[in-house]
Curated annotation (Swiss-Prot):
It comes from Bos taurus. It catalyses: a triacylglycerol + H2O = a diacylglycerol + a fatty acid + H(+); a 1,2-diacyl-sn-glycero-3-phosphocholine + H2O = a 2-acyl-sn-glycero-3-phosphocholine + a fatty acid + H(+); 1,2,3-tri-(9Z-octadecenoyl)-glycerol + H2O = di-(9Z)-octadecenoylglycerol + (9Z)-octadecenoate + H(+); 1,2-di-(9Z-octadecenoyl)-sn-glycero-3-phosphocholine + H2O = (9Z-octadecenoyl)-sn-glycero-3-phosphocholine + (9Z)-octadecenoate + H(+). Residues 420-424 are annotated as: Important for interaction with lipoprotein particles. Ca(2+) binds at residues 197, 200, 202, 205. Disulfide bonds join 57-70, 246-269, 294-313, 305-308, 448-468. Belongs to the AB hydrolase superfamily. Lipase family. This is Lipoprotein lipase. It is found in: Cell membrane; Secreted; Secreted, Extracellular space, Extracellular matrix. It holds the Pfam family PLAT. Residues 246-269 are annotated as: Essential for determining substrate specificity.
Length: 478
């Protein structure tokens, strides 16, 4: 009899040891409604506005009381933040910044951070493969919230960075009903550039998918960020290849000043810029950055795409207009090197006239814009070619809002090297009018020379043009 009691006690201890899971929770409690949630390895921390940096309370799939214990707000929208690959096995510094910005913009919302750090810390190809399992974990969690608490998935916005963007896409493809929105923050390129839609972020994964591409430098499949469009709207700030303030010269300067401690930050500077651009859109609600639809970044650099007709422009970030085109819309914009990132875009068209036929290559100019609010002086630009009796279009941007344009100055910069021909006489062109279109306001302005024609001479004083009246201003904008 005594041996039988000892056997029962041993079996009880054994069963208890088998059913206790991480954090002291009984794994059997994670089997509800016939569904087993014990295979979910990812953790779901509901962070608070008071403590955006710590995972103090976890929502545990299958454990209904965890939702009440964490004070989940069932009547508000929910943001789910999914991090990417990590070298350190720790959250990166952008995570609490994004959480804080989300709460500042939506104080009553729920901001959940998905912890898949143990899987994300592996060699990149291994971690890339784990995105499928992480996506499955997130989908099971969201389906449980919908089934158990009748929480509408239409209130859910997934935000995934790098590998996390693809995990978000996989999650969205597996939920019983579509989530409202997925934002891909520079989705990872290697292992995903040529992947089929079910294995990566795609437009089918949510009611609306918007993507920021910030580090696509390199050949397809080898660039850190994915190059091809994978959403309803894909935005490529500064062409998407590299971001201002993230150059090699800046890296060397920081290393000289601070040592090697910040090298990893500089390497991922452009990649992580996607997150900070989105944070900027949350914090600067009144001044969203505007992006413009264009067939190529080359056409955008010529200023040919600053139209807002038929949804050709859109806000970048949180306040984006949810335009679901039949095919993905590639959009471009310029930004500053630091927050606030917004700039003001202008298309400038100049016709170079003259009696002699001349062509010059790679010519440097400066233009100064003067408006009702401020001015932006000595903006440099280079034209690959300047020929007599041809019109050239190019893109300019200012970091300040100068208001309505009133006047501009144009200067042709002399070559840095000495030339006898330039010593005796420098080339020049006649310019009568300069046409400018402001992207943010869509206003067109024509500037005229004070004379019938102004002679712009290389290396000489700038030429002044003032706002003039022209019947063509009344034509419908294109």
């Amino acid at each position: 009899m005594e041996s039988k009691a000892l056997l029962l006690l041993a079996l009880s201890v054994c069963l208890q040891s088998l059913t206790v899971s991480r954090g002291g929770l009984v794994a059997a409690d994670r089997i509800t409604g016939g569904k087993d949630f014990r295979d979910i390895e990812s953790k779901f921390a509901l962070r608070t506005p008071e403590d955006t940096a710590e995972d103090t309370c976890h929502l545990i799939p299958g454990v209904t009381e965890s939702v009440a214990n964490c004070h989940f707000n069932h009547s508000s929208k929910t943001f789910v933040v999914i991090h990417g690959w990590t070298v350190t096995g720790m959250y990166e510094s952008w995570v609490p910044k994004l959480v804080a910005a989300l709460y500042k913009r939506e104080p009553d919302s729920n901001v959940i951070v998905v912890d898949w750090l143990s899987r994300a810390q592996q060699h990149y190809p291994v971690s890339a493969g784990y995105t499928k399992l992480v996506g499955q974990d997130v989908a099971k969690f969201m389906n449980w919230m919908a089934d158990e608490f009748n929480y509408p998935l239409g209130n859910v916005h997934l935000l995934g960075y790098s590998l996390g963007a693809h995990a978000a896409g996989i999650a969205g493809s597996l939920t019983n009903k579509k989530v409202n929105r997925i934002t891909g923050l520079d989705p990872a390129g290697p292992n995903f550039e040529y992947a089929e839609a079910p294995s990566r972020l795609s437009p089918d994964d949510a009611d609306f998918v918007d993507v920021l591409h910030t580090f696509t430098r390199g050949s397809p499949g080898r660039s850190i960020g994915i190059q091809k469009p994978v959403g309803h709207v894909d935005i490529y700030p500064n062409g998407g290849t590299f971001q201002p303030g993230c150059n090699i010269g800046e890296a060397l300067r920081v290393i000289a000043e601070r040592g090697l401690g910040d090298v990893d930050q500089l390497v991922k500077c452009s990649h992580e810029r996607s997150v900070h651009l989105f944070i900027d859109s949350l914090l600067n609600e009144e001044n969203p950055s505007k992006a413009y639809r264009c067939n190529s970044k080359e056409a955008f650099e010529k200023g040919l795409c600053l139209s807002c007709r038929k949804n050709r422009c859109n806000n970048m970030g949180y306040e984006i207009n949810k335009v679901r085109a039949k095919r993905s819309s590639k959009m471009y914009l310029k930004t500053r090197s630091q927050m606030p990132y917004k700039v003001f875009h202008y298309q400038v068209k100049i016709h170079f006239s003259g009696t002699e036929s001349n062509t010059y290559t790679n010519q440097a100019f400066e233009i100064s814009l003067y408006g009702t609010v401020a001015e932006s002086e000595n903006i440099p630009f280079t034209l690959p070619e300047v020929s007599t009796n041809k019109t050239y279009s190019f893109l300019l941007y200012t970091e300040v809002d100068i208001g309505e344009l009133l006047m501009l100055k144009l200067k042709w910069i002399s070559d840095s090297y000495f030339s006898w021909s330039n010593w005796w006489s420098s080339p020049g062109f006649d310019i009568g009018k300069i046409r400018v279109k402001a992207g943010e306001t869509q206003k067109k302005v024509i500037f005229c020379s004070r004379e019938k024609m102004s002679y712009l001479q290389k290396g000489k004083s700038p030429v002044i043009f003032v706002k003039c009246h022209d019947k063509s201003l009344n034509r419908k904008s294109g």
